[in-house]
Structure formats: structure tokens, C-alpha cells
Amino acid sequence: MSRRKGFTLIELLIVVAIIAVLVSVLLPALRAARENATLAVCLGNLKVLSSNWLWYAEDNKGKIVGGHTWPTVGTPETKDNPYHWVLRPTTNIGPSIPEQEEAIERGKLWSYVKNMEAYHCPSDRERVASNGAILYGWGSYSIVGTLNGEGWPGCCANKKIRKLSAIKYPETKYVFVEEADWRGWNMGSWGVHVRECPSMSDYFGDRLAAWHVDKCDFGWADGHASVRKWQKDRTVDFINGEYADYNVVAFTAPDTDNADLRFLQQGFPYIP
């Protein structure tokens, strides 16, 4: 009876080389497919949050929900100290996931969006604190400060929008952004420097999250959501921390010709 010959060394090396080539070709495609899937989930989250933010206002005589993260969990709600869309966790720096979830459940928007997954981008895996510690956040999104939030320094510091009717062309104004606060949870509200503030009109402001590398999702005041692919490498560098310290807001060099910054400024809702 004849014996079957096994693979020669050269044949085995050829097979290994072919497998290596296939892996090198397929891995980027698999990574891209996974990223597209998480981007779509995140976009769906912002669609849910934005549409329910809108419904909250419609159910409350046009008054929009508070865009701050206030007060701290356990603080009684009063007329002068109303609850906002989410509250503040009991631990300020690096709160546990259960603490963050409780802060979400105590917020005003929870009765409209009782799905904890809707508050979390699947690409939001970890955050690096200013001391290098790894923190884990749950709430991946923030409301802009001018929408009944904590305001924003400069020209629109005390010009908060409290009624839905004050938002002109809501389909052009965003409400929710992706943010990655260095404290492990998104404290307060988010803001960008508007063009009406001459001394700061070429500066970004608060950083956005870099969950999707060169893209970010936005939730808009008419209830829709969209993806923005950043056009400038400098924008991606800023979002990834090249020009901003984790403890400093707006610590970045001016950028006089940046279409991404103009996009953020044009979509930022405020009263001039």
C-alpha cells in the first residue's frame, strides 16, 4: 500500500505566506466593518435621544429639558434646583458604572428613554485621566450648554435657550454631541466658541470624543441625527488631544481656516 506524501517545507511556507496575505487584506476590512457597525449604533442612540428631547419639550409646553448634569444624585429636587436631563454622580472623578447609571436613571429624560444602552456609544471603551489613570465612562453624550444648560463663556454666557420656539431652523442646530470628559463622565454641558466673540472665534472650545477616529455623530433639534466626517487633519488631532490638555477648556492654537470649526459654530444654538 502506497503512503501519501506530506507537505514539503516549501509548500508549507507557501501556505503560511498565503494565509498571512489574506489576513493582512481581511483585517482592515473587518475593522472597518466593525467601526461602521458601532457608528450606526451610536447614530441610532442620538436619533433616539434627540427625538425624545423634542418630545419632552412638546409635553412640557415648549420648555426644553435642562442640559446641565445637575444636581448630585440624592439631592432633593426643588423649584430653584430642578433636575436636568441626567444628574451628577456621587463620585466626581472616576465614578463607577453603577453610579453613572443611577445618575442617568434619576434624570428628566429617563422617563422618555428607559434604555441604558441608548446613552452609551459602543466605541466608548475607556478614557485617560489627566494623571494617566484609565477611567470607564457610560454616558457618551452631552447637551450643548446654551440649551438650558450651564451656559458658555463669552458672548452667550447668560443667553440660555429655555423654550423650543427660540430655536430658529432646528434642523440646522445640534443638541447632542459625543464627548469624552477626562473625569470619566461628561460633567456639565458642551460648548464651542462662536464667531461673534472676536477674541476666541478661531478656537474650538470643549473637545469632542474620538470614538470614531475621524468622524462624530450629532443629534439635532428637529429630532434627526447625522455623521460628520472631519475634513481637516488638525481637527482630528485636536479631538485626539494633540492641542488640548485634559484639564483645560479651549487650550488650543487658533485655527483661522478650518471648515470643521465653522461647521460647529454654525450649528451651535445660541442667542446673539
Predicted regions and their residues:
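Generic N-terminal leader/processing signal
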Residues: 1-3, 29, 45, 193
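N-terminal single-pass transmembrane signal-anchor helix
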Residues: 3-34
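Juxtamembrane interface helices immediately C-terminal to a transmembrane segment
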Residues: 25, 34-45
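Short, well-structured segments within or immediately adjacent to enzyme catalytic domains
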Residues: 40-272
